[in-house]
C-alpha cells in the first residue's frame, strides 16, 4: 500500500469512526437512501427529508429502521395480532431513555403519527401504525430484583415470562397477565390482570414508581411524592401521558409452586358448569383464581373449561379445589402442583404470535340466571370462537375507585369473548360472529378493560373512566396537550 492509498484509507476510517455506529450501518444498508413519505397525526401526508432522518439516526444508540431496511424492518413491524399488517415510516428500536426522548422530540417537531410498542401484544393493534413512527421499546429488556426491599426494576420491553422467571429465583411474584409472552408495559398501564391478582392486586397496583418521557421529550420520575399526578394516571390510564422507560414494582413473597390447571367438561353440561362456577366463585378466598369458559377442543368440538390457580398453602388448596374436581363428570383434570412460571405459559400455544384475533370484553358485577341464559343460549358456534370469565375481586377491590386511574373496582369478573380467524379472507366473518354474540352479553356489563377491547368509540372510552375522567383529562392537558400519544384508549385533551 503506497502512502497516498494509506492516507485515504486512514481518513475514511477516521470519518467512519466519528459517526455513530447505527447511523453508519443505516447508510451502508441503504436504509436512508432517500426521503421517506410519512403521515401526520391528522392523517395528512408529509415527507421526511433524508438529512433529518440521518441526523435522527445518528442521535440513537439503538437502530433506526425504514421500509428499505429489508428483513430487519419486516421483523420489527410485525405485532402479536396478525390482523394488523401495518407499515410505519420509521421504527426506532430504542436502547434506553435517551433514545426514547430523541424519538418523541423528532415526532413532536413534525407532528408525526406515533405508536409505542412494548411487547407488541396490543389486541387492537395500537402498538403499530401506517406511515408514522413506532417507538419500539422491545430492545429494553433489563430487570433488576432487590430481594431486601422486595422490589423489581423493569424496563418496558420486558415480557411477563421474563419477570416471572427473575422473580421466581428470589421467591417473589408480581401479577403479570395470563399469557407469558404479553409485554409488561402495556399490560400494566391498562391495569394488568393476572392469576394472582385476587391476592396481590393488579399489575398497576404493584407499581411504586415509573420513569416516563412526556410529549415534550422530558424524562420525568413519578411516584407518590414526585409528579404524583403522572404516577396516578399511568396506573390504569393507558399510554396517554408518555412513554414509560422503567417501572418499579412491588415483589410479593409467593411461589414458586402453585396448585392449578384445568378441569374440562362436555359442552352438553355448559349451563350446569356455569351455575356451579358462579356459586363456588362467590365464596372463594382471594388465594384462588377460578375462571370458566368455552374453547375449541382437540377435535374441533367446543369444550367447557374451569381454569384454576391456588397461590396459598398447597395442602389447603387441595381441600379447596376438591369440590371443583368432584363436580359432574369431567372429561379431563390436569390440576396439579406445578411451578407458577409453567402455569403462566399454559395458554401460550393457542395464543402464539401472528394469531388473527378479534375480541370484546366487559366487567360483570353478578352472575344472574339471565346472564347465564344469555351466555349459553346465544353461544357463538364458530369453530374458532371462545368465551371466558376471568375472576376479579379480592385485592383488586381493596383499592378505591379514585385511588388510581383504573376505572372498575367492584366487578366479580371480566367477561370476554373472541374469534380466531384462520387467514385474512375470514377476518370479517370472525369479527361479525364476535360482535353478534356480544350484542347479547353487553347489556350485562359495567365498563370494560381497556387492554382487551377493539374498535371502541371515543364516547364509550370517556364514559368508561367514570369519575376519573376529569382528572385524567387535566393530566393529559398538562403533559400531552397536542395528543401526540393517541393510539391507545385515548383521552382527548381539552386545551
Model-derived regions: residue spans:
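Soluble FAD-dependent oxygen oxidases
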Residues: 2-495
Amino acid at each position: 500500500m503506497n502512502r497516498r492509498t494509506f492516507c485515504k484509507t486512514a481518513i475514511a476510517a477516521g470519518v467512519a469512526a466519528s459517526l455513530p455506529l447505527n447511523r453508519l450501518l443505516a447508510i451502508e444498508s441503504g436504509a436512508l437512501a432517500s426521503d421517506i413519505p410519512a403521515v401526520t397525526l391528522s392523517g395528512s401526508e408529509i415527507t421526511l427529508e433524508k438529512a433529518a432522518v440521518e441526523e435522527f439516526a445518528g442521535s440513537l444508540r439503538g437502530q433506526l429502521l425504514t421500509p428499505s431496511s429489508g428483513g430487519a424492518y419486516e421483523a420489527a413491524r410485525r405485532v402479536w395480532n396478525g390482523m394488523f399488517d401495518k407499515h410505519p415510516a420509521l421504527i426506532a428500536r430504542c436502547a434506553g431513555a435517551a433514545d426514547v426522548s430523541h424519538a418523541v422530540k423528532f415526532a413532536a417537531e413534525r407532528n408525526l403519527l406515533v405508536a409505542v410498542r412494548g411487547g407488541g401484544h396490543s389486541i387492537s393493534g395500537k402498538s403499530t401504525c401506517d406511515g408514522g413512527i413506532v417507538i419500539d421499546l422491545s430492545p429494553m429488556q433489563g430487570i433488576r430484583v432487590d430481594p431486601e426491599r422486595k422490589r423489581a426494576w423493569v424496563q418496558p420491553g420486558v415480557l411477563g415470562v421474563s419477570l416471572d422467571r427473575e422473580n421466581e429465583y428470589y421467591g417473589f411474584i408480581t401479577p403479570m397477565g395470563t399469557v407469558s409472552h404479553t409485554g409488561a408495559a402495556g399490560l400494566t398501564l391498562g391495569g394488568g390482570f393476572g392469576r394472582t391478582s385476587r391476592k396481590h392486586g393488579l399489575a398497576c397496583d404493584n407499581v411504586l414508581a415509573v420513569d416516563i418521557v412526556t410529549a415534550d421529550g422530558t424524562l420525568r420520575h413519578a411516584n407518590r411524592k414526585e409528579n404524583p399526578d403522572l404516577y396516578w394516571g399511568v396506573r390504569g390510564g393507558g399510554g396517554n401521558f408518555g412513554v414509560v422507560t422503567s417501572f418499579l414494582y412491588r415483589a410479593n413473597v409467593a411461589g414458586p409452586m402453585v396448585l392449578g390447571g384445568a378441569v374440562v367438561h362436555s359442552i352438553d353440561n355448559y349451563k350446569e358448569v356455569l351455575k356451579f362456577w358462579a356459586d363456588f366463585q362467590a365464596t372463594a378466598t382471594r388465594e384462588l383464581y377460578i375462571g370458566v369458559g368455552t374453547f375449541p377442543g382437540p377435535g374441533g368440538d367446543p369444550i367447557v373449561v374451569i381454569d384454576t390457580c391456588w397461590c396459598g398453602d398447597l395442602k389447603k388448596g387441595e381441600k379447596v379445589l376438591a369440590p371443583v374436581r368432584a363436580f359432574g363428570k369431567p372429561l379431563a383434570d390436569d390440576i396439579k402442583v406445578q411451578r407458577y412460571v409453567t402455569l403462566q405459559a399454559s395458554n401460550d400455544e393457542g395464543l402464539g404470535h401472528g394469531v388473527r384475533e378479534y375480541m370484546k370484553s366487559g366487567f360483570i358485577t353478578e352472575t344472574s340466571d339471565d346472564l347465564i341464559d344469555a351466555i349459553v343460549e346465544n353461544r357463538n358456534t364458530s369453530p374458532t370462537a371462545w368465551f371466558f370469565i376471568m375472576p376479579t375481586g379480592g385485592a383488586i377491590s381493596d383499592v378505591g375507585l379514585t385511588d388510581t386511574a383504573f376505572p372498575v373496582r367492584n366487578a366479580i369478573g371480566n367477561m370476554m369473548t373472541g374469534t380466531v380467524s384462520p387467514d385474512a379472507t375470514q377476518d370479517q366473518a370472525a369479527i361479525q360472529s364476535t360482535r353478534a354474540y356480544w350484542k347479547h352479553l353487553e347489556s350485562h356489563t359495567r365498563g370494560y378493560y381497556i387492554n382487551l377491547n377493539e374498535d371502541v368509540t371515543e364516547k364509550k372510552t370517556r364514559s368508561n373512566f367514570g369519575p376519573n375522567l376529569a382528572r385524567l383529562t387535566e393530566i393529559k392537558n398538562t403533559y400531552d396537550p397536542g395528543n401526540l400519544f393517541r393510539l391507545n384508549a385515548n383521552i382527548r385533551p381539552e386545551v
